């Protein structure tokens, strides 16, 4: 099959990482897989994609995300492929419109349980039309599927309807063993100097809650812990200013955009994901793969993977997070038990299984 993955960009993020992880595995199954980017800016993930996939064609439409001229370009490009698979909002909509001028089969992945558009009631009919153009809609977790059906309503919730069967769940996956056996970053190992290092890998954006991690650090006192934030984004300045105001700036490290996340995870002692909402976080699964205890906010998209394996704290509850961090540092047996349980859970979300299920979806579409 000739498959085109369409996404906004290859800046670091969950959907972007999933695409880069999927491409070589789908190619190994005998498929031709190319990528189309709305914003073709050179990034670390772009370089990795090219290095791991000799001969791949990367189509770049421009440098923005919402240029309507992209629809014309997409209509021309799509004719070269059997399957076009979209990720993120603007590619979903623009490809749906472009499909009016192409017979290519369409698939999309819904990566979130919530977004701002779902608060716009007037937009729901547009999304219903858009999703109706797709032969299949993959949700990255069961809760993401439930929330999408709830939002769409109508035939999307009626088991007798053709539209109902268009939506299925394929859990996100990561290369679990690559994370497990990564070499810790030497610079970070030396820098923590006996402190317990708590790392959160996430962009500084609306859905993420680095603020609670900083507040938890301020409650711990002493000099036993430090926090590492790997990622960039519009809220980084806010979080940095909070660290200063709470008197913990000397124990918070902003690592910036990292292309060696497994090495960062292995250098840390505890891994945290503090969020307001998620789809199914790849950082969640990566964190649980590292052989370290994983702590997450008790919210949709994190709860489903973490509960019963890692540790959960109420959303925004810095005191509860601080208490869990304290116990993990003080109780070696508890620390080891949680770490082993997390790794066992992560193995249920291996990228090999994700790729095989995506391939099954594509083959089913080809038979329709």
Spans of features found by a protein language model:
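N-terminal strand-loop element at the rim of the active site
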Residues: 2-66, 149, 156-163, 233-235
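A conserved mid-protein helix/loop that constitutes part of the nucleotide-sugar donor-binding site
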Residues: 13-24, 196-219, 234-240, 319
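Acidic anion/phosphate-binding donor-loop and adjacent secondary structure
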Residues: 65, 69, 149-150, 164-190
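A short, active-site helix/loop in glycosyltransferases that binds the activated sugar's phosphate group
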Residues: 134-166, 174, 178
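Aromatic "clamp/platform" in nucleotide-sugar-dependent glycosyltransferases that forms part
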Residues: 257, 276
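Conserved acidic donor-binding segment of nucleotide-sugar-dependent glycosyltransferases
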Residues: 296, 311-318, 327-332
